[in-house]
Amino acid sequence: MNFGRVNPAQTLDAQGITGLGEVHYNLIEPALVEAAVKRGEGRLGRGGAFLCSTGAFTGRSPKDKFVVRTPSVEDTIWWENNAPMDPEAFDRLHADMLEHMKGRTYFVQDLFAGADPELRLDVRMVTELAWHGLFIRHMLRRPERTELDSFVPEWTVINCPSFKADPARHGCRTDTVITLNFDKKLILIANTEYAGENKKSVFTLLNYILPGKGVMAMHCSANHAIGNTDDAAVFFGLSGTGKTTLSADPSRTLIGDDEHGWSDKGTFNFEGGCYAKTINLSPEAEPEIYATTSKFATVVENMVYNEETLELDFDDDSLTANTRCAYPLEYISNASATGMGGHPKNVIMLTCDAFGVLPPIARLTPAQAMYHFLSGFTSKVAGTERGVTEPQPTFSTCFGAPFMPRRPEVYGKLLQEKITSLGATCWLVNTGWTGGAYGTGKRMPIKATRALLTAALDGSLANVTFRKDPNFGFEVPTELHGVDSSLLDPRSTWADPAAYDAQAKKLVEMFANNFAQYVPYIDADVKAAAIG
C-alpha cells in the first residue's frame, strides 16, 4: 500500500521492488518524526528534536564498503583503495535483500544531490527506518512538492539494517555491507543503522561522477563574504582539524560544512544540511550548532540524555565519542539559501599537527598545494584510539581517502588546474600543537588561528613579510598585528630548539615516505615541491 506523493510512473513497483508492506513516499519532517516515534525508533527530545541510537555501529564501516567490478569502471576505479565485488555476488545480495524486504514498511525520499541544477543527481533513498528518511531529507536537497510529480531517480540507495549479509554467498567481508554498482546505478546498505553511511555513499558516488565532467569533488567546508559570493573560500580537512568550526564564521555566509563541488561556474554544496559532531559541544564555543540540538526534527544521534528531563549530556562519550546531530542548513542563521558561491579566492588545507612542528599558517604555491592535498596529513593523539601512546601521523589523501573512488592524482590535477587558472591563494593551517608535541606543548590558540584566517581571507595577510620555512619550503608570515609573533616561528616556541629540529626531521621523513606512492603520477613542478 502506497502513501504520500510520488511520480506514478516511478513507484518502487515500477523499479521491480515489489511485495512490500506499506511504502511511504516523500513524507515531510513532522510525519517522519511522528512515524519514527510511533515505531519506537527513538524519542522526542526537547524542542522536538529526535533522539536515537544506532546500536552496535556508531561510525562508518569502511572495511565493509565495496565497488562492483565491471568492465565500465575497471580502468577508472582506484582498486588499491576500493574493495571489489563480483557482479554475480552483487546480484545475489540484491535479490536476497528484496526478498527480505517483502511485507515490511519502507520510507522513500526523492532528493537532489547537489545545489547546481545542471550538475545535481536525482537520488532515491529507500530506508527501513523512518528516522533514516528524516536524516537524508536533512542531508540532501529537497525538491519542491510539485517537482516530485515528475521526479525520475537516476540512482537508488536501499538501506536495510535488519538484513544480514552472508560473506560466502554475497562476496563481502562480514554480515555488514555497503556496495556501489555503477552499471545498475544502485547502492545497497545492510546491517548497519549508522546514518552517516547514507550520506557518504552518495558522496562517494558524486566523487566518481563529477570529475568525469571536469568538476572537482571536495571533502571540505565552504563559505563566502556576506553579500559577495565571488569572495569564496574552501576548507579541506580531516576529522578533528576544525573544518566545521572555522568555516562557521559570523562575518561570512556558510555555503556548507562537508561536501562541495568546484565547477566552471564556482562552488556548490552537494548537501542541504549539516552532520555535526556534538561531543563537548558548548553554547559558548559554537552557539548555533548547539542551538540546533533542541530544534524540531533535528536528529540527535547516540547522545546520552536524562531519561526524565531529556536533557542532553554533551560530555558523555560512553556510547561513542562520535556523537552527532543532523539538521537542515536553514537552522544556521548565516547559511546560504542557494548553496552556491563563486570560485574560491582562498583554498585552506587544515591539519592538526600533534608533533608541534608546523606553523599556524603557511602560504602554498599551486604545486605545494597539490603536494599537501595528495598527502592529506593530520595526526592521531594518545587516547583517540586504543594503543596510541604517542602522536601518530595519518595521511588520508585528498583529505578523504575512504570516499575517493578514483585515483588520488585525478583529484589532485583537477585542483591544481583550477587553482592555477583562477589564481586562488592556498594556505596550510595548523590547528594542532605548538611549543612541543602533544603532551608537552599546548594547543594552538583558536583566537590566533581565527585572526590569521581572517587576515588571509580579507587579503591583509598578503601585505606582511614572509620567510621560507627551511624544512617544508612554504612561506610563513613573520608577524601579524594581534598575534604573538613567537607562534609564527614554531622552533622558537620549543624550550629545546635541537629537539624541535629532530622532530621536524622526523616529520619530513614521514611525509616523504608517504608521498613516494604518488611520485610516478605527478608532474615536475609537484616533484620539485616535494619535501624530504
Swiss-Prot record:
Q: Which residues bind Mn(2+)?
A: 200, 219, 258
Instruction: Enumerate the cofactors the protein uses.
Output: Mn(2+)
Q: Which positions bind ATP?
A: 200, 219, 237-245, 286, 324, 449
Which InterPro entries does the record cross-reference, listed alphabetically?
Answer: PEP_carboxykinase_ATP (IPR001272), PEP_carboxykinase_C (IPR013035), PEP_carboxykinase_N (IPR008210)
Q: Does the keyword DNA repair apply?
A: no
**Which family, according to UniProt?**
Belongs to the phosphoenolpyruvate carboxykinase (ATP) family.
- Any idea what job this protein has? Involved in the gluconeogenesis. Catalyzes the conversion of oxaloacetate (OAA) to phosphoenolpyruvate (PEP) through direct phosphoryl transfer between the nucleoside triphosphate and OAA.
Q: What is this protein called?
A: Phosphoenolpyruvate carboxykinase (ATP)
Q: Which gene encodes it?
A: pckA
